[in-house]
Amino acid sequence: MKRQNLPRTTLALALAAAFGQTLAAAPLLEMETVEVIGTTPLPGVGLAREQIAGNVQTAKSRDLEDAANLNLPDLMNRRLGSVFINEVQNNPFQPDVNYRGFTASPLLGTPEGLSVYLDGVRLNQPFGDVVSWDLIPRSAIASLSLMPGSNPVFGLNTLGGAIALQTKDGYSHPGAAIQATYGSYQRRSVEFEIGGHNDKGLHWFTTGNLFRENGWRDDSPSDVRQWFGKLGWMDARTDLSLSLAVAGNKLTGNGLQEQRLLANDYSSVYTKPDETRNNAFSLNLAGKHSVNDDLLLSGNAYYRKIRTTTYNGDINEDALDQSVYQPSAAERTALANAGYSGFPTSGANAANTPYPYWRCIANVLLNDEPAEKCNGLINRTETRQENYGLSGQFSYFGKLAGMKNQFTGGGGYDASRVRFRQSAQFGYINPDHSITPVNFYADGSELDDNGNPIDSRVDLRGRSQTWSIYATDTLSLAEIWHLTLSGRYNETRIVNRDQLTPGGGSGSLDGDHRFSRFNPAIGLSVTPSRALNVYAAYNEGSRTPTTIELGCADPANPCKLPNAMAGDPPLKQVVTKTWEAGLRGVLGAKTQWNAGVFRAENQDDILFVADNQAGYGYFKNFGKTRRQGVELGLDSSLGAFDWGVNYTYIDATFQSEETVNGAANSSNDASSKGLDGNIVIRPGDRMPLIPKHLFKAHADWRINGAWSLGLGMQAVSGSFARGNENNQHQADGTYYLGSGKSAGYAIFDLGAKYRANRQLSFFAQINNLFDRQYSTAAQLGATGFGAGGNFVARPFAAVGGNYPLISSTFLAPGAPRTGWVGVRYEFGK
């Protein structure tokens, strides 16, 4: 079906002009409270909301302190419009945060379309542009601004938006507090904060957090340790500060689960473990100085070091079409000679051997085919990153041709060093779906059926440098008209050196890449009355290809998986062009509303496409994708009640044709069901993991001076699974299981707070109040387990020498009903 286009920005401009003419005679009323919002990564003076041509959203520290918000993604998911979460990793500190269909994720290989800044330091990491949410301490955040669109001032990866965070200091948050919580699944946490200043201008702030839980899914504990400190000095014109952040976290997120196994046991896991350890250290020296009433200087210099290791137990999909049950005579002899006993002498099959392992062990002893006979795999990675840089900007406030004008210009330099290592060790699956490793590695010592070495090793060193300059100017054409022009030029160099296959050429990851681009933006805002503000904007943003994408972009050397790097040819930058228009205003004294439309088109988007060799592919630039939609919001206060609603419609579609691997998709072009094949994406097909409809509501009731209650609701429509990019998958109950979608859902949360006095308060929180079983994401894939959880290889007879497999829909389950209670004591009040 042909998609109907959204109105052009010119229509909104005409609408703004019409409102300006109609209401020109009305007297201009000043807002009682003017909220100033920073419009650059570095702290500056900022602009009033009514001067910003976009649906910017903000939150304060008191919002983060709400007991319902475990971390920053929780707050954004519950309260900010157009934000939703995919829990692909299934750990509360490792979500994919999506805004208007663009993502900030901690998972390598995810296209990162949102930039995140903390006190002017870009948190997107050098390797993969990922964002590790567990490294951001909730209790250190003073404010959050979600800037919409491809705002070029915020630099690379600002395709759909930018998240700008500012931390607390001793002036903004003096005093001390300690808080403790305990709840479901052995969740317990303790956090503290201390802030203050003296009459000499010295100020200080420190906070720490210790969080542990067993997790609601099997074998999914987490241990989070965060500390943040800031020391500074301030006088009437100058503010200097040095901040330090340290984190040491161990996270277990056991990921997606096959739909039948999830229906049998909602807490079950497909394979385990899936552990991530993050250790991080960062320093940031920041300052600003007011030269005079018209000129403000600001800047920072930072250093950050992160070490990430992963240990993942997975199924070896290359064993699914193999004979893995009955050891041969030679294998039985090898087992006996090695001292093993108890192995079957004949007749072993899927019915009587639910978890086979003897052929795996025997093939390791014989150095024969363990890569095919071992049904388990242990994947290990280590990433070491160092990045550092400095930036500076100036803001000038004056007049241009007699009109008020605010100009900000700046520049920055960012550099990084990265080393990434990956290995894979074979093993076998146990009854609890853990993996027992054996002494055989995917290190190139064995060939596959096509004669290619089985080698999953990666050892890559990389360096990058980015120079940038930017400027933004807001000109008040009249008292109610504000025109903003912005632009940023980025020049990035990425140098990769393969430690296993140096020197370039086929299969080498060596590469030297340069990317540069100027991204412009223009916005117009008009405020004809206190009750109405109209805006329209156009902006552009870009991102450079990641090392993961560059490392698997060679058609002559396709990869089995996106992270099985094999070559390093050039890719183009992804460029996003965003149009946005809307209205916002107030009704009475305590009601605010907004309505807007947006369209973002990605050019040269990067997609993992299929190769002629079954199951293989490579990254390439893919025509166009489009994300467009409508946003509506309403917030109000009525006596002791505060309430609000947000609705978003997102139409996210592919706009070009491409062939991609669709082995688990029922509509693929394979000669027989259950075999490997490709699917064709066509313009208009909906993009996976992006729901069409989002609705959020919340209500807070201040019962009296001591008691308060809060109720929240999130409703999300269904979305297509990864692997179902053509939207054509249909279950047949035999070869293909599940709908290829995740269903829509609505969940509620309820919180209560009791303030005993100015210092002491108690709180309780219940999330997923009605214990709804739901999923936030889905993916198609071959399954190695039957409905009862037993391993099954060769589930069907061979067709033309190939063995069909069972493919299913894998789901990312949401947390069941969970509750916790807590106490907070604030000193000095």
Locate predicted features:
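Surface-exposed extracellular loop regions of Gram-negative outer-membrane beta-barrel proteins
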Residues: 248-263, 417, 493-500, 512, ...
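Face-selective signature of the C-terminal outer-membrane beta-barrel domain
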Residues: 239, 279-311, 315-317, 321-499, ...
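C-terminal beta-signal and adjacent terminal beta-strands/loops
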Residues: 542, 715-727, 753-829
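A beta-strand signature from Gram-negative outer-membrane beta-barrel systems
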Residues: 123-125, 134-177, 189, 826
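Membrane-embedded beta-barrel scaffold of Gram-negative outer-membrane proteins
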Residues: 290, 296-302, 306-314, 527, ...
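Transmembrane beta-barrel wall of Gram-negative outer-membrane proteins
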Residues: 182-212, 217-254, 273-296, 486-488
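Periplasmic plug
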Residues: 89, 94-148
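Gram-negative outer-membrane beta-barrel transporters
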Residues: 391-396, 478-479, 590-603, 618-725, ...
